[in-house]
A protein has these predicted regions:
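Sec-dependent N-terminal signal peptides
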Residues: 1-20
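Boundary at the C-terminal end of the N-terminal hydrophobic targeting segment
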Residues: 20-24, 32-34
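Catalytic glycan-binding domains that act on GlcNAc-containing polysaccharides
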Residues: 24-26, 37-232
Length: 232
């Protein structure tokens, strides 16, 4: 699986900073039914990939159901302005836009973010990595205000997107550099992103790719004839 994941055109392919897991525990979602009741079009527009990704993430972030059978999402998105729907819609749009500009698969970017932080902008690892893609403030994060500036981060924290565009852009830059450093191999690039070593065998790369496949399944299940393009 080499640079075959690196993309062309409007759809999609695909970094050492976070040596830890800031991910909350998710149960495996049974289906994409929960997202069907939510119309994300008003929030993300008609862009088919952003829409498909938002629906997949919506289902992925459900942790349980209420007694009335209503889906309950992870805590971090329930406390922002507009609630989980606003955060999911905003981050899905940001992920799609920044990924397309970087020629990286948005579903891979989302998988990295889920694996790194559970898509929680305020997640902090034991080594101080922050943001949805967990940038280390001593390395790539030292140029990103959200990572190193506490007052700026506080101002961003309640916004649906939590100023994550700059974080995602920096993370994707690091990821692409890592893939190049590791000979164009996506799995080795992911290993470097997590550990700083191309040949590190700690299960991180396979877990990211597994998360990507899960998101694709959920997106396809919720697509209902949408024109999103999926790369398997």
């Amino acid at each position: 699986m080499r640079i075959t994941l690196l993309l062309i055109g409007v759809v999609f392919v695909s970094a050492w900073h976070s040596r830890s897991e800031a991910v909350p525990s998710f149960s495996e979602p049974a289906s994409a039914q929960a997202a069907e009741a939510i119309d994300y079009r008003a929030a993300v527009g008609e862009h088919p990939t952003s829409l498909a990704l938002a629906r997949a993430i919506d289902t992925r972030l459900i942790v349980r159901e209420s007694r009335a059978g209503e889906p309950i999402h992870v805590q971090h998105c329930r406390v922002v302005a507009g609630g989980c729907r606003a955060r999911i819609a905003t981050l899905s749009r940001l992920i799609t836009e920044t990924s397309n500009r970087a020629s990286v698969d948005p579903f891979l970017t989302a998988a990295i973010a889920l694996r790194e932080s559970g898509l929680n902008p305020l997640a902090v690892s034991p080594v101080g990595a922050r943001g949805v893609v967990q940038l280390n403030p001593k390395y790539r994060g030292k140029t990103v205000p959200f990572i190193y500036n506490e007052s700026y981060r506080e101002q961003c924290s309640r916004r649906p997107g939590a100023c994550q565009r700059e974080v995602i852009e920096a993370g994707l830059g690091l990821y692409k550099w890592a893939v190049s450093r590791c000979g164009g191999d996506v799995q080795k690039g992911l290993a470097w992103y997590n550990s700083g070593r191309c040949n590190k065998q700690n299960g991180y790369a396979s877990s990211v790719l597994r998360e990507r496949r899960r998101l694709l399944r959920l997106a396809k299940a919720a697509a209902s004839g949408q024109a999103a393009v999926f790369i398997n």
